[in-house]
């Protein structure tokens, strides 16, 4: 791709399915539930390696439980298992219509989820950007938003939910520690959506992302943001104005009501801020995720309020 593509709906449907990976390759699919009506958020996260080793994760936070509730299951999946019916322990994921519809569920001891996702726009594939996906962070990835209908039960308490979901899919090499820092940002109202991924590695900053509104998706060419930390160096305020390749702009304000904390590597720490947003004046939901080198984060957090 030598210029900024606009034909996002033509991204091949085979990439909605499982990929053949090298032994050091990794494939993962994040499904993020944003539930401000309960003060809750969570995710279901299937991942697998080229070796066949796989993991399913479920994680939720909310005011009804004092600590983040997490469950996971590790195992080995068959080489011929597809995303039409991917199963591991308590997790099942089924891509029922490529790049459009997904069923996903978790039946654990504390967490039980059954959800149906339907996309509201075409997938944004990083390969459609002239510089593609940074190769240390995968061969490719797609980002997509959609509507979700879910029944969620945590510790026996029911949380029926109709809302909006953030979903991403990545495959290929994944060397978490190379990024010194990244910002993985999403916002959606259902009618409009925005995403950007700003990665800082090897002294360079890479930006990928899209703006979707009025039925048109375009690459982002600029993001201008401000944010503020709390005393634990968790992002609590975030505002951004984005500009796309057609010169369109959107302004989004994030009211971060809670943070999911996770890590997939001892060198990194991931703080996923879950938010209500105002997107060009319309209500929506979003994600404001900051990833840090763990040594830097552990050192710098004592100074975040004063200097950050």
What is the meaning of each model-derived region?
Residues 1-308:
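Structured soluble/peripheral alpha/beta segments that form catalytic or ligand/cofactor-binding pockets
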């Amino acid at each position: 791709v030598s210029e900024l593509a606009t034909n996002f709906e033509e991204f091949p449907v085979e990439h909605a399915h499982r990929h053949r990976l090298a032994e050091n390759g990794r494939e993962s699919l994040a499904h993020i539930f944003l539930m401000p009506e309960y003060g809750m958020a969570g995710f279901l996260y299937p991942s697998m390696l080229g070796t066949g080793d796989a993991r399913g994760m479920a994680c939720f936070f909310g005011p009804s439980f004092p600590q983040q509730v997490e469950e996971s299951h590790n195992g080995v999946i068959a080489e011929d298992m597809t995303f039409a019916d991917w199963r591991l322990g308590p997790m099942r994921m089924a891509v029922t219509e490529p790049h459009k519809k997904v069923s996903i569920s978790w039946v654990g001891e504390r967490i039980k989820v059954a959800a149906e996702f339907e996309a509201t726009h075409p997938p944004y594939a990083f390969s459609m950007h002239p510089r593609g996906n940074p190769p240390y962070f995968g061969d490719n990835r797609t980002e997509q938003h959609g509507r979700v209908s879910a029944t969620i039960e945590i510790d026996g308490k029911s949380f029926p939910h109709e809302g909006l979901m953030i979903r991403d899919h990545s495959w290929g090499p994944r060397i978490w520690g190379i990024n010194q820092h990244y910002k993985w940002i999403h916002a959606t109202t259902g009618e409009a959506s925005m995403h950007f991924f700003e990665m800082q590695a090897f002294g360079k900053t890479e930006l990928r992302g899209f703006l979707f509104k009025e039925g048109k998706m375009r690459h982002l060419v600029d993001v201008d943001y401000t944010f503020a930390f709390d005393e634990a160096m968790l992002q609590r305020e975030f505002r951004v104005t984005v500009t796309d390749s057609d010169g369109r702009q959107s302004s989004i304000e994030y009211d971060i009501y809670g943070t999911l904390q996770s890590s997939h590597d001892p060198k990194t720490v991931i703080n996923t801020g879950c938010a209500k947003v105002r997107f060009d004046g319309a209500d929506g939901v979003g994600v404001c995720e900051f990833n840090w080198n763990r040594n830097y984060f552990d050192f710098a957090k004592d100074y975040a309020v004063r200097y950050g």
